[in-house]
């Protein structure tokens, strides 16, 4: 045992020496310029722009592959993906705290975009790989940790809003472009273009994105072990449960994002099937909603955070979400969908405000763990939400019986015949369920305190997060973080 320990110490000293030499010599190129929010923004934009191009083609392939149970199978596929994301997010977040953000940005983007070229090669493999890619579908987790590394606490809500707005911006034009190119040139060209954009995103990370995690925040050795407790999402949630305020935030995220995830997965089908929207109308709807979301998550979010504070901004966003879901649930006319879309854009301020609040619960070297935990909850919702919505559509006999397709032409609007009549009391039953879920989230969020006891919050969180901290992690003097969940104005 003694000889083994000596060998281990010698190996650690060798690693430390190699690391010092690399640092002294400047190491390998780490990207273009200093780490900035704009690096994260470009990564997010390219990834989701590539997937946005496939909005219309995916509907066609989904219906052709599962003609009898389109809504239900869509929910199950997204459910498996979301469950795997939930299981893997804490581990990837913790590993990024140790090994840096750049390598995991590369990993998550690569595997998230891996299914794209398979759409035309083999639809069955396409949907299978989509399900399995959930293991690495945690780009937002790493991106938010990247942003937290390079911003001060008072800057984070604006930075998170910019990232979320970029996600919305990627959906402003990409579905319309994808639908147009598919109609004129065929869906194969759309798949090739989406694949090229995904490759561009990967190359951008390799060449241009610098590492954001400061060297002093990493463990002293490269071979730092990751405990199974860090890799276990349920253990992470149990530890969070020891802190009542963090638990309230997690419950709020779960109850509010569960219907949102279901809405994302089925809303395009709903507009086409029930509201009789044409492909052009759907693309225009997505574009308008995206533009309004960008305005809400940048200008409006900044003003609200400055004027009413972090918690009240979350409550307001939840209120808008309840209104838009109820409107979609009872709405039976196209103009109601457009009006509810404007309200839905305002509700998009909720998650960046929650992310800003959550970021205050962790030290600089714990941002990946905390954001990974929240992304894990969202990943679980990404599994449960689509499956739940698909099941509710199924039991209410809402199914995609006919899709207006002429070859690869998605522009012809042929009204599908369906036995779900427009005179139903509740045209959109899953959305009404979602409104009830968000109402519960709002009631839970009311118990999140405006201000917290500084000394108690700090010591309590350090005690609970102690097992996540690596023994070699250091923090420079004078870098003490502000207490947890202190509701300061931006």
Curated annotation (Swiss-Prot):
Tissue distribution: Expressed in various tissues.
Cytoplasmic side: 62-74, 125-126, 182-188, 265-284, 335-337, 401-427
Membrane topology type: Multi-pass membrane protein
Entry GO MF terms: transmembrane transporter activity
Native source organism of the sequence: Mus musculus (Mouse)
Residues annotated with N-acetylmethionine modification: 1
Extracellular face of the membrane: 1-40, 96-103, 148-160, 210-243, 306-313, 359-379, 449-490
A UniProt-annotated Pfam family: MFS_1
Entry's Gene Ontology BP terms: acrosome assembly; sperm mitochondrion organization; spermatid development; spermatid nucleus differentiation; spermatogenesis
GO CC annotation, single: membrane
Record-stated family: Belongs to the major facilitator superfamily.
Region (Disordered): 466-490
Glycosylation site positions: 12, 453
Keyword terms of this UniProt record: Acetylation, Glycoprotein, Membrane, Transmembrane, Transmembrane helix, Transport
Cellular localization per UniProt: Membrane
Membrane spanning residue stretches: 41-61, 75-95, 104-124, 127-147, 161-181, 189-209, 244-264, 285-305, 314-334, 338-358, 380-400, 428-448
Record's protein name: Hippocampus abundant transcript 1 protein
Superkingdom of origin organism: Eukaryota
């Amino acid at each position: 045992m003694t000889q083994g320990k000596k060998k281990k110490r010698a190996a650690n000293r060798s690693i430390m020496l190699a690391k010092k030499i690399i640092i002294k010599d400047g190491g390998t190129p780490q990207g273009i310029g200093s780490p900035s929010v704009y690096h994260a923004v470009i990564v997010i934009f390219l990834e989701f722009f590539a997937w946005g191009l496939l909005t219309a083609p995916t509907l066609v392939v989904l219906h052709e592959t599962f003609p009898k149970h389109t809504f239900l199978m869509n929910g199950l596929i997204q459910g498996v993906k979301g469950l795997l994301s939930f299981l893997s997010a804490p581990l990837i977040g913790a590993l990024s705290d140790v090994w840096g953000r750049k390598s995991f940005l590369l990993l998550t983007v690569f595997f998230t975009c891996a299914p794209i070229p398979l759409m035309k090669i083999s639809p069955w493999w396409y949907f299978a790989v989509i399900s399995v890619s959930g293991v690495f579908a945690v780009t937002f987790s790493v991106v938010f940790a990247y942003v937290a590394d390079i911003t001060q606490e008072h800057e984070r809500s604006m930075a998170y809003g910019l990232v979320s707005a970029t996600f919305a911006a990627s959906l402003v034009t990409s579905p319309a472009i994808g639908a147009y190119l598919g109609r004129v040139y065929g869906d194969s060209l759309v798949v090739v273009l989406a694949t090229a954009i995904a490759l561009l995103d990967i190359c951008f990370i390799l060449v241009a994105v610098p590492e954001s995690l400061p060297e002093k925040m990493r463990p002293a050795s490269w071979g730092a072990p990751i405990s199974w407790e860090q890799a276990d999402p349920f253990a992470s949630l149990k530890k969070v449960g020891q802190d009542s305020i963090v638990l309230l935030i997690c419950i709020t995220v779960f109850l509010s994002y569960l219907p949102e995830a279901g809405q994302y997965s089925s809303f395009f089908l709903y507009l086409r099937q029930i509201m009789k929207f044409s492909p052009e109308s759907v693309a225009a709807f997505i574009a308008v909603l995206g533009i309004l979301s960008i305005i809400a998550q940048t200008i409006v979010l900044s003003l609200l955070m400055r004027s009413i504070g972090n918690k009240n901004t979350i409550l307001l966003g939840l209120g808008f979400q309840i209104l838009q879901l109820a409107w979609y649930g009872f709405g039976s006319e196209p103009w109601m969908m457009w009006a509810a879309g404007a309200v839905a854009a305002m509700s998009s301020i909720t998650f960046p405000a929650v992310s800003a609040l959550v970021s205050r619960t962790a030290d600089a070297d714990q941002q990946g763990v905390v954001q990974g935990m929240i992304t894990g909850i969202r990943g679980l919702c990404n599994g449960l939400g689509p499956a739940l919505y698909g099941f509710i559509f199924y039991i209410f006999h809402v199914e995609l019986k006919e899709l207006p397709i002429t070859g690869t032409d998605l522009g012809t609007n042929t009204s599908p015949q369906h036995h779900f009549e427009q005179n139903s009391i509740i045209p959109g039953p899953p959305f009404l369920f979602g409104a009830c879920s968000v109402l519960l989230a709002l009631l839970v969020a009311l118990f999140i305190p405006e201000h917290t006891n500084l000394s108690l919050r700090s010591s309590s969180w350090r005690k609970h997060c102690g097992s996540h901290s690596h023994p070699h992690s250091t923090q420079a003097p004078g870098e003490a973080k502000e207490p947890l969940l202190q509701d300061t104005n931006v």
